[in-house]
Amino acid sequence: MVDPVAALCNFNVLEVIFSYLDLNDLSRCSQVCRSWHHFLNDENSDVWRWHCLHKLPKEAMKSDLLTSVSTYKTKLRAYFHAWSPNDCSRNVYIKPNGFTLHRNPVAQSTDAARAKIGFRHGRHAWEVIWEGPLGTVAVIGISTKDAALQCHGYVALLGSDDQSWGWNLVENHLLHNGDMQGSYPLLSNAPKYQVGERIRVILDCDDNTLSFEKNYEFLGVAFRGLPDKKLYPTVSAVYGNTEVSMVYLGTPLDG
């Protein structure tokens, strides 16, 4: 019979040790044995709380931005999937919260940003929240690493080439390879996007499709036949001082 005091002691020791390991090591530890896997599977444990509080910016933890990711582990995961400060237009910077981009007021420029991590396998979902004016063009979607992140003028940059796919929220049009692929969503008098609404983007790399949800309503498949390439969450914007946040959610829930 296991001594409960000894078991608690082992639990506390593991907690301390795991708090000092990096995330890659924690992933490997979860595969060592059933006990460690069970221990680390608690997404609100003190281990994940410690890593979350030490790695996430305080601005993010204090805001309402992460309400869709309820556990410490999912908040931490969302942070590592957020906008990349090294993969965006020179006219864009990532705010201290780590999740929100800010487009500087530069005339005659369209500017884009990509997430830190792209996907080639599996199913993935993330939320995009446009927190400032849309301007004449505001596009959300995906791109490969080869898609441009800045161009002259006010245009739909995301979707302007064969390396990107986007939904222009201003005109409710789908864009790819420089062409309008049709209206979206396929509804009569589809409502326009309202600033602050959360749009859920769903990338299915197994089925090669991109879809969107708004207000928990599935809007339909937007793009089919996506290539077998690593695809990144991306947005492009034209309005000066507008801001766009992105929160990675993980595997989408069906139904």
UniProtKB/Swiss-Prot annotation:
Fetch the InterPro entries from UniProt: B30.2/SPRY, B30.2/SPRY_sf, ConA-like_dom_sf, F-box-like_dom_sf, F-box_dom, FBXO45-Fsn/SPSB_families, SPRY_dom, SPRY_FBXO45
Which pathway is recorded for this entry? Protein modification; protein ubiquitination
Gene Ontology terms describing biological process: negative regulation of synaptic assembly at neuromuscular junction; neuromuscular synaptic transmission; proteasome-mediated ubiquitin-dependent protein catabolic process; protein ubiquitination; synapse assembly involved in innervation
Q: Where in the cell is it found?
A: Synapse
Q: Where is the F-box domain?
A: 3-51
GO cellular component annotations of the record = neuromuscular junction; SCF ubiquitin ligase complex
Fetch the SUPFAM superfamilies from UniProt: Concanavalin A-like lectins/glucanases, F-box domain
Task: Indicate what this protein is called per its UniProt record.
Answer: F-box/SPRY domain-containing protein 1
Classify the source by domain of life.
Eukaryota
Q: Which residues form the B30.2/SPRY domain?
A: 61-253
Q: How does it assemble?
A: Component of an E3 ubiquitin ligase complex composed of hiw and Fsn.
Q: Which family does it belong to?
A: Belongs to the FBXO45/Fsn family.
Q: What does this protein do?
A: Required in the presynaptic motoneuron to down-regulate the levels of wnd and restrain synaptic terminal growth at the neuromuscular junction (NMJ).
**Alphabetized UniProt keyword annotations:** Neurogenesis, Synapse, Ubl conjugation pathway
Q: What is its main location?
A: other
Q: Name one Pfam family in it.
A: F-box-like
Native source organism of the sequence: Drosophila willistoni
Gene responsible for this protein? Fsn
